[in-house]
Amino acid sequence: PEICFHLAAQSSVVISVEDPLLDFEHNLLQPIKLIQTLISTDCKKFVFSSSGGTIFGEPNIIPTSEEDFAGEPVSPYGVAKKKLNDFIKLMLENEKMSYSILNLSNVYGPRQDPHGEAGVMSIFTGKMLNNEKPIIYGDGNQTRDYIYVADVVSALIKSSENDNDLFL
């Protein structure tokens, strides 16, 4: 392939805590093997969909900026995603294949499962459509980034046109 878009992952934070070895296998080891295979081909670009919220940890100050985050993941899932970002940069540093990494947070859109552990937009919408009150954890002062799935598709395509970039 000329461009490889890698969006596959074991995406459950809960599973990553319950079975960190499984998470390591799916979110670090397999993508590294994929990159090694792609290096031996004529692939020119590797575009990776990482995870924003889980790799940066919780913000120290609200309202927040990028500098206000603790910078440390709080789950094996976040650790694997953060380390894979580092591996991509390291592995492709001296290769003919360039990369783009998109650290996406809380992607939402049509057909998203309202019964999963993540996807607060679909969970809240599903509850409201069923005349149920959404459950808010914490004190309600938490902050999160959200991005619509069509905007993610546009960002992935645009990122394939740039070399060796990290997008937050």
Task: Please describe what each predicted stretch is.
Residues 1-26:
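NAD(P)H-binding glycine-rich loop region in Rossmannoid oxidoreductase-like domains
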Residues 2, 44, 165:
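Short acidic/polar active-site loop segments enriched in Thr and Asp
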Residues 4-10, 46-52, 102-104:
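SDR active-site strand-loop-helix element
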Residues 11-15, 37-45:
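A short helix-coil junction within the Rossmann-fold of NAD(P)-dependent oxidoreductases
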Residues 18-33, 45, 54-101, 112-116:
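Catalytic helix-loop patch of NAD(P)-dependent Rossmann-fold dehydrogenases
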Residues 58-62, 86-145, 149-160:
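NAD(P)-dependent short-chain dehydrogenase/reductase
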Residues 161-168:
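Mid/C-terminal beta-alpha module of Rossmann-like enzyme folds, strongest
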